[in-house]
């Protein structure tokens, strides 16, 4: 909590020193809605990209978007009407994942090359996307590890991320045959027959 408060203060100081015409906030509503409020209180126009998912939960946050956000840039088409009905100007920009995935599609290795690169055998692959935060790994990977025991004819590959230490994953993979690869999420998905995915951005990917 102290770290977040310090980062908030540093952001506010940097924005004040720069004195921008507008502040563009991207996702992360727990932090950025507080920044939006601060910006409005200091006469700075606010533009918010990737709207908080108020249509799914904690809908009361709509009133804060209405008060503190001048322009909302949205990634889902249905959000346009939703926010319009709430009196909020929203412009559909689409999801950046579409472009990111399309750009990667042509550079992905073949399933055979992926297997060879990561020392995998010829059994069908099931990708495990347990999340990108410590808490998600803790909550999801143990269940995924137990699942792997029920399907010995498949090889399970957990897609890790570089900002979480490999030992965090290994802690929950002990005694299982799960393989670990790092920063190869798209490659792993492309080579897999199926995937077990923690709900979130990875589901859309």
Enumerate the language-model features and the residues they cover.
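Active-site and donor-binding regions of nucleotide-sugar-utilizing enzymes
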Residues: 1-118, 129-140, 150-153, 161-163
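Structured loop/turn residues at beta-strand edges in well-structured enzyme cores
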Residues: 18, 67, 121, 176, ...
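Structural motif
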Residues: 21-22, 125, 194
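Short loop/helix-cap segments at secondary-structure boundaries that form the rim of catalytic
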Residues: 80-87, 167-175, 205
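Residues that mark the start of a beta-strand
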Residues: 125-126, 155
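Donor-nucleotide binding loops and adjacent catalytic segments primarily
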Residues: 134-193
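Short alpha-helical segment that forms part of, or immediately flanks, the ligand-binding pocket
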Residues: 186, 204-205
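Acidic donor-binding loop of glycosyltransferase active sites
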Residues: 190-203
């Amino acid at each position: 909590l102290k770290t977040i408060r310090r980062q908030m203060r540093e952001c506010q100081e940097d924005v004040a020193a720069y004195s921008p015409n507008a502040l563009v906030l991207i996702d992360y509503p727990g932090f950025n809605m507080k920044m939006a409020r601060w910006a409005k209180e200091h006469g700075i126009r606010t533009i918010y990209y990737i709207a908080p998912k108020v249509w799914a939960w904690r809908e009361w946050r709509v009133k804060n978007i209405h008060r503190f956000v001048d322009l909302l840039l949205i990634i889902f088409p249905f959000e346009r009407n939703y926010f319009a009905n709430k009196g909020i100007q929203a412009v559909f920009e689409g999801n950046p994942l579409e472009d990111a995935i399309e750009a990667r599609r042509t550079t992905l290795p073949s399933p055979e090359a992926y297997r060879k690169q990561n020392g995998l055998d010829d059994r069908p692959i099931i990708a495990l996307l347990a999340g990108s935060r410590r808490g998600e790994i803790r909550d999801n990977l143990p269940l995924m590890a137990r699942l792997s025991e029920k399907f010995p004819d498949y090889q399970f590959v957990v897609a890790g991320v570089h900002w979480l230490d490999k030992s965090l994953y290994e802690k929950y993979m002990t005694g299982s045959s799960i393989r670990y690869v790092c920063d190869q999420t798209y490659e792993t998905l492309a080579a897999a027959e199926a995937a077990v995915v923690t709900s979130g951005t990875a589901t859309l990917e």
